[in-house]
Amino acid sequence: MQLGFAMLADPILLITILLGFAMAWAIGANDAANSMSTAVGAGAITPRQAVIIAGVLEFMGAYFFGKTVTETIRKGIIDPSKITDPNVLIFGSIAALIGATIWLVIATKYGLPVSTTHSIIGGIVGYGIVYGGMSIVNWDKMIKVVLSWILSPIVGAIFAYLVFRALSKTVLQSKDPVKSAKRWSPFWIGLAFVVIGTMFYIKVLHGNSLLEGFLKYGMPAGILTFIVVSLILEKRFPATDPYLGAERVFRRVQVITSAYVALAHGANDVANAIGPVAAVYTVAMFGLAGAKVPVPRWILALGGLGIAIGVATYGYKVMETVGKKITELTNTRGFTIDFSAATVVLIASWLGMPISTTHTVVGAVIGVGLARGIKAINKDIVKDIIISWFVTVPAAGVIAGIIFKALMMLMG
């Protein structure tokens, strides 16, 4: 449906559209910046190249692969059956957007990578408690969210630590690095593309069968990549220094893995910005309220554009934190982080475990750093990041609760 005069004449809907765009911008500045942080930190691409690539792919992911039906209340975190008044859903959505956006802007200002999903959940819980008390919150779901704070970075760190140790042993520290790099690099890169292909089916195309994704996309992508990389390395190893040669092999691949992360992020996390907009749009235009609502393409475009602009204008702060401040990254370390984070998220999706991509990426960065010893980690930065994770839900919730209360009193 096109943006008509009647729609634009509705001030509440117009405000919600602007807030949704602001939230999308904040997602781009914070969460989307994660997709390119390791590539920038390892020197695979420049920050300018990173924001262009991330911006284009985030928009493509949101517009072409974003879900056309979204939840009005993310993750079923509060009971929608207890919200019978459409005005509550409208003002609650506005309050949740404001709460989440303000917190994301604060976190981004200090270069802290936080979860946008947790931010919008915090906003929803905040207005939900103000409206219906503690009983309106689905505490079983909330416990799963809290568990994801703990599980995501730990699992990401352990997996990345083990992968990097294995990669170092097979490629970087062998007796004949050139021979080992030619033999093992295609294996590791092919394995990464098995995960990427399968994840593309699950996360971007929103498929339900992990086995189908593995057979249709993952396995063919992995085998093809293995063959291509093997042929290239057999003909020409890209350096006289074997260590630098191995790093250059993984540099090219790291750009591809980071680009995939950006595409998948746009497809998935755009819902955090446009879900509340779609809810208000449906109520305003059709007088309908429900647990799920259709999402017009123009709303997906709005979200994708906001994310792209957010990456381009303010994404450098979080990129710098994740890519440079936690630990020193090389191309093999950056590849390990992307591969580990994607694999952990894929396995978690298969098992139905709650997991945060942001927390997993940061955990993987820490794990790679720990593989070189505890002194390789900037402990002060890690401490600040962990504190920000635990503050995210309550901070967004308190802001949203105050905004919701003020709106309800104002509109009487």
Curated annotation (Swiss-Prot):
Main location: membrane
Subcellular location: Cell membrane
Sequence similarity: Belongs to the inorganic phosphate transporter (PiT) (TC 2.A.20) family.
InterPro entries: Phos_transporter
Protein purpose: Potential transporter for phosphate.
Annotated source species: Pyrococcus furiosus (strain ATCC 43587 / DSM 3638 / JCM 8422 / Vc1)
Membrane-spanning intervals of the chain: 7-27, 50-70, 88-108, 119-139, 143-163, 187-207, 213-233, 298-318, 335-355, 384-404
PANTHER family xref list: PHOSPHATE TRANSPORTER (PTHR11101:SF80)
Coiled-coil regions listed in the entry: none
UniProt-recorded name of the protein: Putative phosphate permease PF1020
Gene Ontology CC terms: plasma membrane
Membrane topology listed for this record: Multi-pass membrane protein
Biological-process GO terms, alphabetical: phosphate ion transmembrane transport
